[in-house]
């Protein structure tokens, strides 16, 4: 009993050691807890964030460096590897690989259709790729051989536009597709249009001053024609006035012979020659009009025939000077007037004046 008690007491006595062990355990537990917390903090960014970083940056890549920097800063890890990781994602590698794979496929399909380069004639051709390559890939240009270009240029020289049967025939002869022939003709028409427009613009710029000089020369040429036509009109009016003057003289002679009031003498002859010397000049009718108009009126009326010889004084030098003075302003006005006086009319007027002077001197 005592032994057992001793055992129990020993056991009881041994409890403080256990208590001591238990009392010594809390710091171990604290260390364990702190280590577990540290391990958890270490394990969290290594295990949990990768799927978080793989999903979120694809949706919002700008938010990734903001979350990564505060999490990795207490551990001393640099954020550079996290920033370099996004361009190396597998889905991005697959897309790049797909682009690289699509480009050779498209080039091989275009090469299978025909050689790819620029045509020497400057007419680029775009070929439609047969395979389902990348939608954004640019279609390349087709090169034509010299024989193909020669035949196409010949056909374009004769026909700017092709009908479909002829287009199919040319495509079969030149080993081209119908679309290639159609596009070549479209581009060739545009090139021809540009060339013609540039030539027209160049010719218009080169002929600008020459055309203006030609216009001035035409105007200068038209002026003499107008003068000549005016001279012809003056000649026609002069001849018409001569005829009318002759008819007036005949009428005057018939009237004077019918009445026979007094024999005609030198003064009556002067009166018969005096009337209307001015109808040849259109501008002189205003100044010499009263004197010239009174002649036929007085000659046609019976009182004019009854006038005695003493009333009609022979023309003196003063009267001739007055007549010339009266005629000179009319001539100056006629020269200033826009109506041109022909030389024939002027000569006829001067001849009429000289005949009057000669008749006056004879008496």
Curated annotation (Swiss-Prot):
Main location (coarse class): nucleus
Locus of motif Antp-type hexapeptide: 88-93
Gene Ontology cellular-component terms listed: nucleus
PANTHER family registered for this protein in UniProt: HOMEOBOX PROTEIN HOX-A2, PROTEIN ZERKNUELLT 1-RELATED
Region (Disordered): 30-88, 98-117, 189-220, 268-308
Keyword annotations from UniProtKB, A to Z: Developmental protein, DNA-binding, Homeobox, Nucleus, Transcription, Transcription regulation
Keyword NADP: no
Name the UniProt record assigns to this protein: Homeobox protein Hox-A2a
GO molecular function: DNA-binding transcription factor activity, RNA polymerase II-specific; RNA polymerase II cis-regulatory region sequence-specific DNA binding
